[in-house]
Amino acid sequence: MSSKYPRSVRRCLPLCALTLEAALILLFYFFTQYDASLEDQKGLVASYQVGQDLTVMAAIGFGFLTSSFRRHSWSSVAFSLFMLALGVQWAILLDGFLSQFPPGKVVITLFSIRLATTSALSVLISVDAVLGKVNLVQLVVMVLVEVTALGTVRMVISNIFNTDYHMNLMHIYVFAAYFGLSVAWCLPKPLPKGTEDKDQIATIPSLSAMLGALFLWMFWPSFNSALLRSPIERKNAVFNTYYAVAVSVVTAISGSSLAHPQGKISMSYMHNAVLAGGVAVGTSCHLITSPWLAMVLGLVAGLISIGGAKYLPGCCNRVLGIYHSSVMHYNFSLLGLLGEIIYIVLLVHHTVWNGNGMIGFQVLLRIGEFSLATTIALTSGLLTGLLLNLKIWKAPHAAKYFDDQVFWKFPHLAVEF
């Protein structure tokens, strides 16, 4: 029988992280430079504000959204910040290298930083399926692989299907969800007897998670409009996302009460259902020209989110063996799929309205993009999961899953692990 004491990462974590950071510094020294163009000052400030909104979403929003576990809230917040910082650095280099042929100096602009931040957001979505079961060394590996896979997907889809930045960004929902679920499927599945309570949501951490959801709710319009170039499309994206998430809040509270036998509201449902409209409307937010359609999408997305949170976790536990109380992945995968379908419907309507006869071709292109992104997400996720199972990473023992004491010093404890 193996020991239940956690495996120390004192040697491998500093060595791995600092060596990687030194390598990134060298790459930035030799292969990057700042944008020397004289950009309009007003446009510069506006561009920075969008990037600032994305950073707040990533660091505070997603960081606290995953902090609802009873004994794993410290690690959830701090590890998310660690992955964000590492992911942005690698994404800037990767996007620059993949977008240039022949290779040259990577020019760093505010737009490239926004693009890199969205790549790191993918990791923060997918890692929710494995937080509590892996250590920081394994998360470093996961960040590098997922950011690389997502960057490859963007490059391939952009070159083959001639897709713009916004449409590439909107594949992030489904890509991140299926990548994370694939990784989780490869990890040890059932929790050991006597440790199930660690996977439960506590009152105070759940309130912190709701704080993260509020930050995401406020800044989701900035996320959906971050990579759009046209001012009219950006305006439509902001308006439609705002109305969609507003309706999602009303639907989340009402639907949560309806789903409970005594009519009580579940905070765990609220964490994700309030964001449902923003996910569902994201792909087509720039095409919708009337608020009522965005509001309908917010209503439908909120109901799907509540239904998925109530019924899908048990189904996935039995069929896939993925034991996790969080419902974020079911929301992002289902609502990302809904958003893709709505986009295709609106695209067909727009094509018919303008008298263009290439309807079937346009639909096939969109289905091809979605299928390619999903396939690469599943494949790279499975490979990452198998890689994380290697013993060299010193993964925590299953008895120490969802336990902050494995990674953090608690001053009030007389004996540390």
UniProtKB/Swiss-Prot annotation:
GO cellular component labels? plasma membrane
| Membrane topology per record | Multi-pass membrane protein
The GO biological-process annotations, alphabetized, read as: ammonium homeostasis; ammonium transmembrane transport
Q: Which residues cross the membrane?
A: 12-32, 44-64, 77-97, 125-145, 172-192, 203-223, 238-258, 265-285, 287-307, 331-351, 358-378
Q: Which UniProt keywords apply?
A: Membrane, Transmembrane, Transmembrane helix
Domain of life, source organism: Eukaryota
Major location, coarse class?
membrane
Q: Where in the cell is it found?
A: Membrane
A GO MF term: ammonium channel activity
Concerning PANTHER family, the annotation shows: AMMONIUM TRANSPORTER, BLOOD GROUP RH(CE) POLYPEPTIDE-RELATED
Family (UniProt): Belongs to the ammonium transporter (TC 2.A.49) family. Rh subfamily.
Q: What does this protein do?
A: May be part of an oligomeric complex which is likely to have a transport or channel function in the erythrocyte membrane.
Q: What is this protein called?
A: RH-like protein IA
Name the species this protein comes from: Pan troglodytes (Chimpanzee)
